[in-house]
Amino acid sequence: MMRRLLLMLPFVVFLGLAFFLYRGLSLDPSARESALIGQAFPAFTLPTLEDPDTEVDESLLRGQISLVNVWASWCPTCKEEMPQLLALSERGIQMVGINYKDARDLGRQFLEEFGKPFEVNIFDPAGDLGFEIGVYGVPETFLVDADGIVRYKHVGYITPAQVDEVMMEVEKWR
């Protein structure tokens, strides 16, 4: 009897691992919940990417709806996302970029090459602000309402098909 149980143990372990693997692979990574939803965007004071002597803070995200996109020059999907961000910037939304864990010169070159959808680019070379807002990886996009409250988070790059979905979220909070 004991021998039979020992022979079945690897099979049971295999089934358990297979279940958890299947469950993990079936989850949508862009649907991750964020503890920041419904909370004020965290306080920060950081320089802009363009000018190290110009600092901005969280007040930048008050008074109008903003899309805050976390990006980096070393991120291949950030390049793919740029046309969609440019399209969103043409729809009258304040676009704010957070250049995450990057070198200033590389971030500037990236924008020269792929476009400048952002009114302001926050330079976060150490990733401290990214940590505060719970960034898992880049790109990630946050919708911040006119009161500075985070209302929506999109994990991963925004595809052409998702531009209208993002705009529907924007319209909910206008």
Task: Place the predicted regions along the sequence by residue.
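Short gly/ser/thr-rich secondary-structure transition/capping motifs
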Residues: 25-27, 47-54, 76, 121-124
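A short beta-strand-turn-helix
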Residues: 44-67
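Short pre-active-site segment immediately N-terminal to redox-active cysteine/selenocysteine motifs
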Residues: 64-66, 70-74, 137
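Structural microenvironment flanking redox-active thiols in thiol-disulfide oxidoreductases
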Residues: 79-115, 125-131
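Thiol/disulfide oxidoreductase modules built on the thioredoxin-like
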Residues: 112-117, 124-171
